[in-house]
């Protein structure tokens, strides 16, 4: 067991346009090589495209709903018992839920064909908003794995 104290959570300020802490965390996840201004440009451009395509007045509400649709509820964790390793289903902590959803959205947006990340991100957010696409499939696969290993749920720690 670690003798050190737990690291304190950093409080990040909201983003400059919408004042949302969640959106600022998303921008930080999109950022590569410390280029935050480029990440902001990509995310704000994607939000505008997203809101325009869906006819939303407030892009932030649509973004939060898309993120909510992508959040996993259960995941599997490896647990070694004796000589065997079991995939034990556990509930995902609230912070980790949003973190995983953001990572999946960004990963699938980057893997979309085409050069423009802004367009890929907007399309992935639209897919999440409509409960379809690669991110939602990843979430369903995670839930399916947890459901398949429900027999090992008593190995929780």
From Swiss-Prot:
InterPro entries with a match to the protein in the record: Ribosomal_uS7 (IPR000235), Ribosomal_uS7_bac/org-type (IPR005717), Ribosomal_uS7_CS (IPR020606), Ribosomal_uS7_dom (IPR023798), Ribosomal_uS7_dom_sf (IPR036823)
TM ranges: none
A Gene Ontology biological process term: translation
The UniProt record lists the keyword tRNA-binding: yes
Disulfide bonds: none
Coiled-coil portions: none
Keywords: Ribonucleoprotein, Ribosomal protein, RNA-binding, rRNA-binding, tRNA-binding
Cellular component per GO, a single term: small ribosomal subunit
Annotated PROSITE patterns: RIBOSOMAL_S7 (PS00052)
Protein family: Belongs to the universal ribosomal protein uS7 family.
Function: One of the primary rRNA binding proteins, it binds directly to 16S rRNA where it nucleates assembly of the head domain of the 30S subunit. Is located at the subunit interface close to the decoding center, probably blocks exit of the E-site tRNA.
Subunit note: Part of the 30S ribosomal subunit. Contacts proteins S9 and S11.
Record-given protein name: Small ribosomal subunit protein uS7
Organism encoding this protein: Chlamydia trachomatis serovar L2 (strain ATCC VR-902B / DSM 19102 / 434/Bu)
Gene: rpsG
């Amino acid at each position: 067991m670690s003798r050190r104290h737990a690291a304190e959570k950093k409080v990040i300020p909201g983003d400059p346009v919408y004042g949302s802490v969640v959106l600022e965390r998303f921008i930080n996840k999109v950022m590569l090589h410390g280029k935050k201004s480029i990440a902001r440009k990509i995310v704000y451009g994607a939000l505008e495209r997203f809101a325009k395509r869906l006819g939303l007045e407030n892009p932030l509400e649509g973004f939060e709903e898309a993120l909510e649709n992508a959040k996993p509820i259960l995941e599997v964790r490896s647990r070694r018992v004796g000589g065997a390793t079991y995939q034990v289903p556990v509930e995902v902590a609230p912070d980790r839920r949003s973190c995983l959803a953001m990572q999946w959205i960004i990963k699938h947006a980057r893997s979309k064909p085409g050069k423009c990340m802004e367009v890929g991100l907007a399309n992935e957010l639209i897919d999440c908003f409509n409960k379809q696409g690669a991110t939602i499939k990843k979430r369903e696969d995670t839930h399916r794995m947890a459901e398949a290993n429900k027999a090992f749920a008593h190995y929780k720690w």
